[in-house]
Amino acid sequence: SLTINNAKKIQTQPSYFDSFVGYWKPQVYPTDVELYQDRVEWFTNNHLDATKISDYNNFGVSTDVTDDDAISVIIKDKKINKINTAIAGNKLVVFTDSGNFIHNNDTFTPNSATFLKQGSTGGANVKPVIVRDNIIYVHPMKQAISGYAYNFETDGYAGQDITILANHLFENKKIKELAYQQEPYSIIWVLQEEGTVLACTYLRQQQVIAWTPMDFGGKVISIGVLSDGSNQELYLAVQRKNGTFVEKMPTRLPVADPKDRFFVDCGRTY
């Protein structure tokens, strides 16, 4: 549940924040939520509503607007598109069906909450992941993935399709979830809607992008990466004939005995 604190209301719009929860109805629930510059941001249709700084239940605005007041922004484009997802890193990036929009100021205040369109690919309602300085996001049709990063040559953000060399793995299939395993091998895990999983070894600085289909012997319905303190591990919810199970993929770490290093598709020991 969400409690709205309206201790300080804006005089010119006295009912706006009173009805804030009211327009979160079944057809217009927030599509995503993020934490950026110590504010919680909620995304509904083409609106972004952000709380006051360090006061995550407070959408109040004072009579004389101050830098820590709540923020309400409409993401503007040639046509109205609802916000499908967003992700916060050094900048807040918002994805609609027709564009990628980035907060283009150093501070996020009521007077500096402007967004610049930096790309027309758009993004689906699949949560992106951050791989070092790169945002990995799914295209609107959910059949391709791009990496989104700052380009010094163009002085702007640009996307690169990282699935173009493995199109056969995405034909007639839609992407459901992404997960990123930073250690030990920098792998992006991709779950497709029919339950198949792909692994992408991704090292942008070395220009390494390598895709591999994974067979887990069942239908995977969700994926996630968790840390155990020493390594990051992939967890999967897998539907099998005798039920649904949460499973963990073993980590491929170096071992002392060469016989235990046998990780190949086809091989022979002699």
Question: What residue spans do the PLM features occupy?
Answer:
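Small/polar beta-strand repeat architecture
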Residues: 1-27
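Short glycine-rich loop/turn motifs
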Residues: 83, 97-98
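Parallel beta-helix/beta-solenoid repeats that form elongated, surface-exposed shafts/blades used
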Residues: 31, 84-85, 91-93
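WD40 beta-propeller blade core
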Residues: 101-102, 198
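Core mixed alpha/beta domains of very large multi-subunit molecular machines
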Residues: 62-77, 89-92
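Carboxylate/His-rich catalytic cores and anion/metal-binding grooves
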Residues: 27-69, 98, 104, 111-148
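Beta-sheet repeat architectures centered on beta-propellers
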Residues: 24-28, 78-81, 90, 110-115, ...
